[in-house]
Regions:
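Amphipathic alpha-helical recognition patches that constitute DNA-binding helices
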Residues: 10, 150, 191, 195, ...
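Basic, gly/Ser/Thr/Pro-rich low-complexity segments located predominantly at protein N termini
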Residues: 12-17, 43, 108, 128, ...
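A glycine/serine/threonine-rich, flexible loop-to-helix segment
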Residues: 46, 134-135, 189-197, 258
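Hydrophobic alpha-helix immediately C-terminal to the catalytic Tyr-X-X-X-Lys motif of short-chain
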Residues: 158, 162, 166, 196, ...
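N-terminal Rossmann-like NAD(P)+-binding domain of SDR-like oxidoreductases, especially those catalyzing
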Residues: 1-182, 222
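C-terminal substrate-binding subdomain of Rossmann-fold SDR/epimerase-dehydratase oxidoreductases
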Residues: 28, 57, 194, 200-286
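A generic membrane alpha-helix/interface feature
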Residues: 50, 99, 133, 196-202, ...
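Conserved GTPase G-domain signal focused on the G5
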Residues: 186
Length: 286
């Protein structure tokens, strides 16, 4: 039995689909409080499967989490549940600390109480900060120091450190993966690629921060899910694994490509004031 938190979100739902197909004998339990970014209809293809269960609760609700663990006695817990939008974290950091750090602590306490084979924390390469644009030879590795830029990445880094502390202090069998920017089906349209596609299809302006020179390493979500599957089954306990796409592109080039593919004019592109503390480049060591 695997509990997948945040399974109604973008990456979590794709992971559930992957696991149901790759491991049809597994029982999958999705725990999700259905924030604005969660969509229950995404899970429609698996809702009626006998080996799937959906539970609408928050990972910050200790009683609800313990009740679920008592009922299901999971072997593996994979934590996707997170507030993940940098802009929202700049405006309202507190909810990020609550979900991303406190929620992680509640899950790990439940894992300690009920005993599990593996707890996996899904994290982000944003915990490493950013890289200079003029040094394309530099990449993030698992040894890169944590150097966060936003309240979002700080909350994820705090959770990662807590996970490693639970491993060292209590012997909890944990692994962590840090991924680059994901894209693919069921992506909530506040992030760059789905937002630009949705706006372009409706002939709305395509807002690009600053000059759009910021570089991101793009990872297809299904590739990410396969990597997590591998880590939870074969990864070494206590280790951090970076998962990258080796697919760097400037934001402006992504937007121009979307215009080209959709047959829309680049005149829709609108340059807006840059994000506060905007990271220049993310890239994971290939």
């Amino acid at each position: 039995t695997i509990i997948v938190t945040g399974g109604a979100g973008f990456i979590g739902s794709n992971f559930i689909f992957h696991m149901m197909e790759a491991h049809p004998d597994y029982r999958i339990v999705c725990l999700d409080c259905l924030t604005y970014a969660g969509n229950l209809s995404t899970l429609a293809p698996v809702m009626d499967k006998p080996n799937f269960r959906f539970v609408k609760e928050s990972i910050t609700d200790r009683d609800a989490v313990y009740k679920l663990f008592e009922e299901e006695h999971p072997d593996i817990v994979v934590n996707f549940a997170a507030e993940s939008h940098v802009d929202r974290s700049i405006e309202n950091p507190e909810v990020f600390l609550d979900t991303n750090i406190k929620g992680t602590a509640v899950l790990m306490d439940a894992c300690r109480k009920y005993g599990i084979q593996r707890y996996h924390q899904v994290s982000t390469d944003e915990v490493y900060g950013d890289l200079p644009l003029d040094r394309p030879d530099l990449f993030f590795t698992e040894e890169t120091p944590i150097h966060t830029s936003s309240p979002y990445s700080s909350s994820k880094a705090g959770a990662d450190l807590l996970v490693l502390a639970y491993h060292r202090t209590y012997g909890l069998p944990v692994t962590i993966s840090r991924c680059s920017n994901n894209y693919g089906p069921y992506h909530f349209p506040e992030k760059l690629i789905p937002l630009m596609i949705a706006n372009a299809l409706n002939d709305k302006p395509l807002p690009v921060y600053g000059k759009g020179e910021n570089v991101r390493d793009w990872l297809y979500v299904e590739d990410h899910c396969r990597a997590i599957d591998l880590i939870i089954h074969k990864g070494r306990v206590g280790e951090v694994y970076n998962v990258g796409g080796h697919n760097e592109m400037k934001n402006i080039d992504i937007v121009k490509l979307i215009c080209k593919e959709l047959g829309k004019p680049e005149s829709l592109i609108t340059h807006v004031a840059d994000r506060k503390g905007h990271d220049m480049r993310y890239a994971i060591d290939p």
